[in-house]
Regions:
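Hydrophobic face of amphipathic alpha-helices that form TPR/SEL1-like repeat modules
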Residues: 1-32, 356
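Structural signal for hydrophobic packing residues in well-ordered secondary-structure cores
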Residues: 59, 63, 78-85, 89, ...
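Glycine-rich loop-to-alpha-helix module at the N-terminal edge of alpha/beta enzyme cores
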Residues: 35-125, 135
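Residue-level signal for inorganic ion chemistry
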Residues: 34, 70, 92, 115, ...
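ALDH superfamily catalytic-core signature
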Residues: 233-377, 441, 488-494
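Conserved C-terminal structural/oligomerization subdomain of aldehyde/semialdehyde dehydrogenase
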Residues: 33-39, 260, 314, 364-494
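Short, well-ordered beta-strand elements within core beta-sheets of diverse protein domains
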Residues: 36-43, 58-64, 150, 259-262, ...
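Rossmann-like NAD(P) dinucleotide-binding subdomain of oxidoreductase/dehydrogenase enzymes
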Residues: 127-269, 398
Length: 494
């Protein structure tokens, strides 16, 4: 599989590709082999200023575009993504290290579907009216909030960009968006698609390190809203920056989700759900089912079979269609995951699968870690409480329904979770009792457009992938109309 991309990428400002104002650039590498992929512009404060100015000017006309026409724009974007699906999937795979089977079948088509979903939602959007009395009519309408600053992460660069761009454009907002400096290429390639579809300045893409270009976005007074996906630590900085200017922020942050398996679960479905919960996207998923709770009556058998399945997972070069687990994002993430393996041992848990880096052959050049299963863990261990963000799960034994609910909720986070059981009443009870924004029943990591996604507690604020997010990108306006031709009667007008 050969990749065809530019050697050098600029910033997309006002529908033009431009270099950074000071000429600064940074390199982008393939995490699977360490090879350089491209060079990207490092946006300066002046560049962000220009991008915001372009978005501000474009907003004057974009906000007046009809719902019908905005929906048509979104559909054109979706069709263009489909037309370039194979190319975009390759770019995402080389840039991020995730298997091509995931980018081709999940990331890219799901991104396109989000544009289609919001096009449909937009056509169905209505205001409301209320008659207070025979002479007073109240109209409620929603208007776009303005210029939005968006920052997307490295784990799902293309998909997270689609999650944020689609509702913002549907609402009538204009955007300045920044990808992670580790994974800038798929959004830049999307920029070339948007450049041919959208009016100038509606979407502007600035690239660079979060500590510089990202901070310029957080601090810029020209934004009416911020949207961020990433760690809870950085999310707090985003929230603080927004609060200091009294603007709203949508935050999708960290997680340490519980994946719960009762003794009556469908056996193969349960094993598959445990693997899907922690190995999809190399476990670099904010809602990964990294805490696996298994009922004591099936614990030993479940652990024995799951560990064998972990060992059978094909770790390979991400562009190989048979690869099931690809590369982690960069060297520091490898070291972080392996440090938790050692910590688990120190805390008294056992490693029954994986727990090591692949150092030989082609994979030795990249950031590959074998699927890792930690057993005999307890919920108070650091490995069960801290977000690791890799293909590593801890398995915790439980006895009763009440016990597992209490332990699952004993977490700073509340983003995702799963429950596997053939008892429908139990499934609903547990799903309702877990303090989390998304619960899966007898499945995991399904993220369709139209299903609201977001977190409780320190996992974020707001919901994405659902029409409710349009409320985050709009403001409510109320218009009171007097239908009478008579004065108020409060004053003597004669």
């Amino acid at each position: 599989m050969s990749l065809h991309i530019k050697e050098r990428y600029g910033l997309l400002i006002n529908n033009e590709w431009v270099p950074a104002s000071d000429g600064a650039e940074f390199n982008v590498y393939n995490p699977a082999n360490g090879e350089q992929l491209a060079v990207c512009a490092e946006a300066t404060q002046a560049d962000v200023d220009k991008a915001v100015a372009a978005a501000t000017e474009a907003f004057k006309t974009w906000k007046t575009v009809s719902q019908v026409d905005r929906a048509d724009y979104l559909l054109k974007i979706a069709d263009a993504i489909d037309a370039h699906k194979e190319h975009l999937a390759q770019v995402e795979t080389y840039d991020n290290g995730k298997p091509i089977r995931e980018t081709l079948n999940v990331d890219i088509p799901l991104g396109a579907d989000h544009f289609r979903y919001f096009a449909g939602v937009l056509r169905a959007e209505e205001g409301s009216a209320q008659v207070f009395d025979e002479n007073t009519l109240s109209l409620i309408i929603r208007e776009p909030i303005g210029v939005v600053g968006q920052v997307v992460p490295w784990n799902f660069p293309f998909l997270m960009a689609a999650w944020k761009l689609a509702p913002a454009l549907a609402a009538g907002c204009t955007v300045v968006i920044k990808p992670s400096s580790h994974t800038s290429l798929s959004l830049l390639e999307l920029g070339s698609i948007l450049q041919d579809i959208l009016p100038p300045g509606v979407v502007n893409i600035v690239t660079g390190k979060g500590s510089k270009s990202g901070q310029y976005i957080l601090d810029h007074p020209g934004f009416s809203k911020l949207a961020f996906t990433g760690s809870t630590e950085v999310g707090l900085d985003v929230y603080k920056a927004a609060s200091e200017r009294l603007i709203p922020a949508t935050l999708e942050l960290g997680g340490k989700s519980a994946n719960i398996f009762f003794e009556d679960a469908n056996w193969k479905q349960a094993l598959d759900g445990a693997m899907l919960g922690i190995l999809f996207n190399q476990g670099q998923v904010c809602c990964a089912g990294s805490r696996i709770f298994v009922q004591d009556t099936i614990y030993d058998k479940f652990v024995a079979e799951l560990s064998k399945l972990f060992d059978k997972v094909k770790v390979g070069l991400p562009w190989d269609e048979s690869t099931q687990l690809g590369s982690l994002i960069y060297e520091a993430q490898v070291k972080k995951v392996l440090s938790y393996v050692e910590l688990a041992k120190e805390e008294g848990a056992r490693v029954v699968a994986g727990g090591e880096r692949i150092t030989d052959g082609e994979l030795g050049k990249g950031c590959f870690v074998r699927p890792t299963l930690i057993v005999d863990a307890t919920n108070d261990m650091r490995v069960a409480r801290e977000e690791i963000f890799g293909p590593m799960a801890v398995v915790i034994k439980f006895h009763s329904e009440d016990e597992v609910i209490e332990q699952a909720n004993d977490s700073l986070y509340g983003l995702g979770g799963g429950v596997f059981t053939q008892n429908l009443s139990r499934a609903i009870r547990v799903a309702r009792a877990i303090e989390t924004g998304r619960m899966w029943v007898n499945t995991y990591n399904s993220i369709p457009a139209g299903a609201p996604f977001g977190g409780y507690k320190q996992s974020g604020i707001g919901r994405e992938t659902h029409k409710v997010i349009l409320e985050h990108y709009t403001q409510m306006k109320n218009i009171i109309i007097n239908l009478s031709d008579k004065p108020s009667g409060f004053y003597d007008l004669d």
